[in-house]
Amino acid sequence: IIPNLQLNLERYVIHRLRKETLMADQMIFKRCEIKYMLDITQAELLKNQMKQYMTADEHGVSTICSLYFDTPDYLLIQRSMEHPVYKEKLRLRSYGTADKDTTVFVELKKKYESVVYKRRIAMTEDEAERYLLFHEKVKVTQITREIDYCLKNYKKLAPAVMLSYEREAFYAKDDHEFRITFDQNILWRNYDLSLCKGIYGEAILDKNKVLMEVKTAGAIPLLMVHFLTENQIYKTSFSKYATAYRTIYAREQRRSCPPENFFVFTGDEVVQQAIKC
């Protein structure tokens, strides 16, 4: 993209985002998302203390599957890891393993100055695949126009990383816009890239770790602030997709760079060669 054109595009998007309000009925969400890394003991203690002002989601623990789209050179996640003022991600999400007729969600997640703006549309897995991979036309809405622009702007977007995890969610009793989620058993893979393939892959976190996210359109309750302070729990910029990408990148580097010393066998002779990459 020409630099000036990219700059103008970002200015336009930022202008649009500043004007938006929360419109849940249109599946557009605006909120701040703050992440914390806890151990299991801390998570259980917090859940117990939250009972006085939070209620558990009616679905209990859910399994979430997210298929992230990116360019062949991982432009979207690389850009996100640079911590720019504005960034975006495109993903396809299901609750549990999908089949072709399962309702899934195409999500475009944008972030500007720590505020998250998420758009999503529901369709079957088969429809979503034909829409995202083969650009089959769907009903035109403001959300689909933005997704279409993303598909056009970033050339050759395709499934890049599959993530799955178990999530337990809680809502504030007096404000359903305030949510807290706990994610465990986070798995990733960069093969079998489909929501229909099942839940498996490599673990991102130790079994004792829990990723907590606070999602709010306003302030964090004082009880929550006190708990975090007393337990010395601090916010983190942890990203599931970025963590998976770092592993992918490290492995690609190892494959392209031979070890510093290796041996070549020629009959009875062993020749040691020092190779530096």
Descriptions of predicted regions:
Residues V13-C277:
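Phosphate-end processing signature that detects enzymes handling 5′-triphosphorylated RNA
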